Swiss-Prot record:
Keyword Zinc found: no
Catalytic activity: S-adenosyl 3-(methylsulfanyl)propylamine + putrescine = S-methyl-5'-thioadenosine + spermidine + H(+)
Gene Ontology cellular component annotations, sorted alphabetically: cytosol
Species of provenance: Lachnoclostridium phytofermentans (strain ATCC 700394 / DSM 18823 / ISDg)
Biological classification of the source: Bacteria, Bacillati, Bacillota, Clostridia, Lachnospirales
Location of the active site: 155
Assembly information from the UniProt record: Homodimer or homotetramer.
Residue stretches making up the PABS domain: 2-237
GO MF annotation list: spermidine synthase activity
Protein name per UniProt: Polyamine aminopropyltransferase
Job of this protein: Catalyzes the irreversible transfer of a propylamine group from the amino donor S-adenosylmethioninamine (decarboxy-AdoMet) to putrescine (1,4-diaminobutane) to yield spermidine.
C-alpha cells in the first residue's frame, strides 16, 4: 500500500508527495507538529496539516530570507528573528562572523525540540553561543523595544493561528521602533498567485508601507510551496536593496550557499506584471 501526504494549497488545488513513513506526531499547546519522511523531498515539517519546509528545498527559503538583507546592510551586528523554530534562518545567519547577537523568539518550544531531533539539517546551529532563545509571542516580545536591532527577520508560519498577530500594522510599527535608524525588516510575504493567498499579500504590504519609508518586495521559486512563486517583504529605514547592494564585499566572504548569489539578488526585485498590479496601489 502506498502512503501519500497531501498539502491543501487552495480549496481546489492540492500538492501530494509519496511518503516513506511518519516519523513523529506531537500535539503542542499551540498546534499539531508532524515530521514525515518522503521519497522525493526528504523530511518534511508539517504544522496543523500544512507543509512548512522540506529537506529538499528549504535552503531556497532560508537563504533568500537571510542573505538579501545581509548583502545590503554594511554592519549588521544585532539581529532579531521571530519564528524560525526549525532553525534554518539561524543556520544561515551564523555563517556571518560579524553578527554578535541573535535573539530568536518562537512561541512554540515543542517545534524547536522536534526539529533538533528530526531535522538536524536546519536545527544544527541553534546552540551557537550568539543565539538567545525566547519562548513567547513575537508580538509581545517586540512591543516596547527601542533602537536595539540592525535587522529583524519575521520567519513565521502562514497568517493564521499562532502567527496571526505577526501580520498586523501594530506589529510592524513595533518592529520599526525596535530597529536602529538604518535597520532593515524582512518578512515572508506569502504567494501572490492564488486568489486565496493574494489578499494576505496585499494586506501585509499595505501595513508595512504605512510604517516604513522604503518598502518593496522580492521573489523566489520554492517548488513545494503553493504555486512555487513566493514573495518576501524588504522594508528599510535607509538602505535601498539594489542601490546599496555591496556585491563585492559579500562575494569576498565566499559563504557556502546553494541558491542565493548577488546576480540573483538584483533580479529578484524585478517583479512580474501581475504582482505589480496586486501591490500597485500600495507602492
Amino acid at each position: 500500500m502506498e502512503l501519500w501526504y497531501t498539502d491543501q494549497h487552495t480549496k481546489d488545488v492540492r500538492f501530494s508527495i509519496k511518503m516513506k513513513e511518519q516519523l513523529v506526531s506531537v500535539e503542542s499547546e499551540f498546534q499539531r507538529i508532524d515530521i514525515i519522511e518522503t521519497y522525493e523531498y526528504g523530511r518534511v515539517l508539517v504544522l496543523d496539516g500544512e507543509m512548512m519546509i522540506t529537506e529538499k528545498d528549504e535552503f531556497i527559503y532560508h537563504e533568500m530570507i537571510t542573505h538579501v538583507p545581509m548583502a545590503v546592510h554594511p554592519n549588521i551586528r544585532n539581529v532579531l528573528v521571530i519564528g524560525a523554530g526549525d532553525g534554518g534562518t539561524i543556520r544561515e545567519l551564523t555563517k556571518y562572523d560579524t553578527i554578535e547577537h541573535i535573539d530568536m523568539v518562537e512561541v512554540d518550544k515543542e517545534i524547536v525540540q522536534v526539529c533538533r531531533e528530526y531535522m538536524p539539517f536546519t536545527a544544527c546551529k541553534l546552540n551557537d553561543k550568539r543565539v538567545s532563545m525566547h519562548f513567547e509571542e513575537g508580538l509581545r516580545f517586540v512591543r516596547g523595544k527601542q533602537d536595539e536591532y540592525d535587522l529583524i527577520i519575521v520567519d513565521c508560519a502562514d497568517p493564521f493561528g499562532p502567527a496571526e498577530g505577526l501580520f498586523t500594522r501594530e506589529f510592524y510599527g513595533n518592529c520599526y521602533k525596535a530597529l536602529h535608524d538604518d535597520g532593515i525588516l524582512i518578512n515572508q510575504h506569502e504567494s501572490p498567485f492564488y486568489n486565496e493567498h493574494s489578499g494576505s499579500v496585499q494586506k501585509a504590504h499595505r501595513h508595512i508601507t504605512a510604517v516604513f519609508p522604503l518598502s518593496t518586495v522580492y521573489q523566489c521559486h520554492i517548488p513545494s510551496y503553493p504555486s512555487g512563486h513566493w514573495l518576501f517583504g524588504f522594508a528599510s529605514k535607509k538602505y535601498d536593496p539594489i542601490k546599496d547592494l555591496n556585491d563585492k564585499k559579500w562575494n569576498e566572504l565566499k559563504l557556502p550557499v546553494r541558491y542565493y548569489n548577488t546576480d540573483l539578488h538584483k533580479g529578484c526585485f524585478y517583479l512580474p506584471n501581475y504582482v505589480k498590479e496586486l501591490l500597485g496601489s500600495y507602492e
